[in-house]
């Protein structure tokens, strides 16, 4: 909080009575000039003299962040953060309403998301939330790791089932083996310069998952119940195993000899990839009409295909579980999530 802002109070006049608290609070100061050099100039679509608001999307809502008075059908907002999506809004009787279409602001570039309902395109969706740097790092920790099968606990006769050569781009990675391997014990062993870090591993014989009767691994951090070996077989994509030392391993005992022809592994992840079995609903923003549903789908694999209007802003919701979701648009055939 700052001291009393006399210039703010003098500038507002009687308008404060019809404005959100954020914009007339006399003890709050706008310091965006110290961080953002870009100025936004757009058409407002509202009568001259009225206040137009800008909002950004976060946690399933549009949140107001700036405002300006409409003049000659336009508004100008200095010191606005770039490379974000904004929505022009009006404020009436304590509520915000869209007054136009959302747009991408990148300094001198403005791209309005005006859905073209006459021109539809097919898109393939893999996520509902941005991929942040920490997530890429976690998923990259499996590179160089190997899966080995053996008839004995000591893996003297171990055979390599699969080696992870690159950072996975999805959470659930199903691998069909070139040649089935007969074994009872299977282990995941990390590269020598990495700790063993894995969320899930599942093994299949003739299309059916083989449930292990026991799981063990290299030592973990003492007292840390969040990184235990058993987590690789608990069916929870958010739990994970993490060895204390580099080059660690985690082993499952299948309880019987099985001919393994397929494996599925999940690196440590945020569970915001498309999850088979979950039901999703896709929305696009229709300007003053708000969000418009493009239908629902139940995922049967790790991606969703949708026919959508071109040049639209989207919001994919998981109706089954989870809370983290964010808006995105398509760029060069891929999802782009604008983030702070």
Model regions: which residues?
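Long, contiguous interaction/targeting segments characteristic
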Residues: 1-28, 82-83, 87, 168-171, ...
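Extracellular beta-sheet/turn segments enriched in Thr/Pro/Gly and aliphatic residues
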Residues: 2-3, 9-34, 95-129, 335-340
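Structural motif
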Residues: 32-53, 57-58, 133-137, 269-271
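Short amphipathic beta-strand segments in non-cytosolic proteins
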Residues: 49-69, 147-154, 158-162, 270, ...
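Surface-exposed loop/edge segments in extracytoplasmic proteins
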Residues: 59-67, 95-100, 153-163, 209-212, ...
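Short, surface-exposed beta-strand/beta-hairpin micro-motifs centered on an aromatic residue
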Residues: 70-79, 174, 251, 301-306
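Short Pro-Gly-centered beta-turn/loop motif in secreted/extracellular proteins
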Residues: 73-93, 103-105, 310
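Disordered, acidic Ser/Thr/Pro-rich linker "stalks" and the adjacent N-terminal cap
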Residues: 90, 102-182, 194-262, 268-275, ...
């Amino acid at each position: 909080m700052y001291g009393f802002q006399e210039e703010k109070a003098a500038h507002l006049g009687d308008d404060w009575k019809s404005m959100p608290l954020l914009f007339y609070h006399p003890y709050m100061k706008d310091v965006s000039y110290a961080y953002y050099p870009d100025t936004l100039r757009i058409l407002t679509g509202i009568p001259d003299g009225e206040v137009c608001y800008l909002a950004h999307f976060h946690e399933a809502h549009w949140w107001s962040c700036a405002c300006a008075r409409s003049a000659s059908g336009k508004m100008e907002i200095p010191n606005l953060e770039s490379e974000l999506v904004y929505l022009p809004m009006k404020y009436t009787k304590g509520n915000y309403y869209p007054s136009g279409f959302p747009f991408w602001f990148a300094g001198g570039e403005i791209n309005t998301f005006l859905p073209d309902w006459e021109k539809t395109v097919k898109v393939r969706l893999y996520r509902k939330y941005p991929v942040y740097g920490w997530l890429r790092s976690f998923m990259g920790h499996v590179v160089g790791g190997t899966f080995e099968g053996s008839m004995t606990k000591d893996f003297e006769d171990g055979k390599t089932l699969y080696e992870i050569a690159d950072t996975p781009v999805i959470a659930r990675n199903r691998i069909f083996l070139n040649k089935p391997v007969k074994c009872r014990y299977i282990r995941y062993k990390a590269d020598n310069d990495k700790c063993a870090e894995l969320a899930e591993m599942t093994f299949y014989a003739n299309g059916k998952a083989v449930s292990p009767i026991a799981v063990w691994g290299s030592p973990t951090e003492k007292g840390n119940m969040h990184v235990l070996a058993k987590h690789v077989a608990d069916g929870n994509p958010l739990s994970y195993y993490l060895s204390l030392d580099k080059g660690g391993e985690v082993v499952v005992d299948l309880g019987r000899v099985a001919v393994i022809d397929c494996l599925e592994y999940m690196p440590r992840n945020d569970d915001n990839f498309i999850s088979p079995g979950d039901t999703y609903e896709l929305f696009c923003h229709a300007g003053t009409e708000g969000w418009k549903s493009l239908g629902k789908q139940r995922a049967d694999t790790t991606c969703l295909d949708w026919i959508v209007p071109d040049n639209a802003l989207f919001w994919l919701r998981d109706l089954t579980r989870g809370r983290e979701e964010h808006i995105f648009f398509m760029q060069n055939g891929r999802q782009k999530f604008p983030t702070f």
